[in-house]
Regions:
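Rossmann-like NAD(P) dinucleotide-binding subdomain of oxidoreductase/dehydrogenase enzymes
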Residues: 105-201
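N-terminal Rossmann-like NAD(P)+-binding subdomain of aldehyde/semialdehyde dehydrogenases
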Residues: 1-113
Length: 201
């Protein structure tokens, strides 16, 4: 169950519906479709959107922090610090995208020719987030992977659906391709079945 519960009183403030199996399948399909659109953008274009995401965290810091206070009882000063740190994380990866993604020559042990390490998109990635840092954990996972070109399926902690909703809104607002970042309010059982179905693929 995804719900905002006052950690001091135990009062349930708002409940969020879990997705169905069909909705989960559709989200996964959208993520695979988004891979093509995401990798069609240049690294600089992807980085520009992630840079803007960091700016949105700073512009909305008070609202985002207040959500964390409500959901998990984090002191406001700490919540603001977490949101600000996310702005730094997104900016860090965006500003260094070209450097991080450039081919890295490696020395051949034998023979002739050249060899490089090339970092390229693998496909959709699933992030299962804990409750204690609802913004930071997403930033460090999603930011760099989206710059590479990997779409993100993000399962938030059951205690943090409102912060997940606010994060989704920011990702939508920066104009990433549809399906590139999706919040999925899935059950543990749904995720376990999906992960098991992908074993060895």
């Amino acid at each position: 169950m995804y719900a905002v519960v006052n950690p001091a009183t135990g009062e349930k403030l708002e409940e969020y519906p879990e997705i169905s199996d069909d909705e989960l399948d559709a989200a996964i399909a959208r993520a695979w479709e988004a891979r093509e659109a995401l990798t069609a953008l240049s690294a600089a274009e992807r980085a520009e959107k992630i840079k803007r995401l960091g700016e949105l965290h700073l512009e909305r810091r008070e609202t985002l922090a207040a959500i964390a206070v409500k959901e998990m009882g984090k002191p406001m000063e700490q919540a603001l610090g977490e949101v600000d740190f996310c702005g730094d994380i997104y900016s860090y990866y965006a500003d260094r995208a070209e450097e991080f993604l450039k081919d890295e020559p490696i020395e051949l042990l034998a023979g002739e020719g050249t060899a490089v390490i090339r970092r390229s998109a693998m496909g959709p990635l699933l992030g299962i987030m804990p409750w204690n840092f609802p913004y930071y954990q997403v930033a460090r996972f999603a930011g760099p992977n989206l710059i590479v070109g990997n779409p993100i399926l993000l399962k938030p902690a059951p205690q943090c659906p409102e912060s997940a909703e606010a994060i989704q809104k920011m990702y939508d607002d920066v104009g990433l391709p549809e399906g590139a970042y999706q919040t999925i309010l899935a059950t543990h059982e749904q995720i376990a079945r999906y992960v098991k179905s992908q074993a060895g693929s």
